[in-house]
Amino acid sequence: MKQSDKEIAQTERLENDYEVAQSPIIQKITNKVCGCGYVGSSWTTQSEAKKISKYLELDENSTLLEIGAGAGWPGLYLAKQSGCHVTLLDIPVTGLEIAKKRAQDDRMSDRVTVLAGNAVSLPFYIPSFSAVSHSDVLCCLIKKQEVLKECRRVIHSSGLMAFTVISIQPDLSDQDRKQAIQVSPDFVESEVDYRTMLENTGWTLISYEDITEEFKISCQRMMLAEEVLEEDLRDLKGSMEFEEGKEAWELKLKAFNKGLLRRELFVVKPIKYQN
């Protein structure tokens, strides 16, 4: 499926991010913020991953699809802790290669499938999964509702889906909305809210949590960890990129503290269609 120029640029940036994320310095920061022990760019913390595993009722009989799986966090962790089979799907191949090697190192390759693919057109012809998860993925995609429809198509009728997402608070002034967009993922904007999207695409809401405060804590931890490792980060990235990154974190946290953005956790189940 053809990507727009902006989507291609996003993929190229992610490929580079996964390369850099393998650095021991970045790993130390990631572990400090998320407590995960995995290469990755997801904001999911270990406690959040455990919560998602419970919401999805994962066990050794479960088949999990992780969309936007990156380098395997938290999908590999969910599989390791629950014993389920996980299919990791994403577009950037660098992250998937890292995930594949991690699965081999953890001796769980027999329960891990790694696929390069676009969530707008999932490569499965029948309902194949008992659970679907994605972490801060929809806010990085243009075709959000199309992806939700595809998730609905490939999940069992009794399945569960859990996902986190960053979104812009409603009813902002033009100036505040512009400020929110500037510090958000590439495609954070949407014509309708996520509850409406879910209703439109065949899902019913089971549980909802506003996890904005937890995200703000993660941002603060990130800024502190980078401050502690400033010298190493300057050597790794260069002083200009370090300063740009520092300013970006400050602006992001400022927008969240101002109430312009939120991070949400949705747990849903498919609406059963009438025969």
PLM feature spans:
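N-terminal, positively charged/glycine-rich alpha-helical extensions of SAM-dependent methyltransferases
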Residues: 1-33
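Conserved alpha-helix/loop element of class I SAM-dependent methyltransferases that forms part
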Residues: 42-60
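Class I SAM-dependent methyltransferase SAM/SAH-binding core
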Residues: 63-121
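A short acidic, Gly/Pro-enriched loop at the edge of an enzyme's catalytic core
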Residues: 120-131
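A short SAM/SAH-binding and catalytic strip from SAM-dependent methyltransferases
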Residues: 130-143
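A short glycine-rich, Lys/Arg-flanked "PGG" loop and its adjoining helix->strand segment in the class I
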Residues: 145-160
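Short, glycine-/aromatic-enriched active-site segment of Class I SAM-dependent methyltransferases
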Residues: 163-186
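Conserved Class I S-adenosyl-L-methionine
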Residues: 209-275
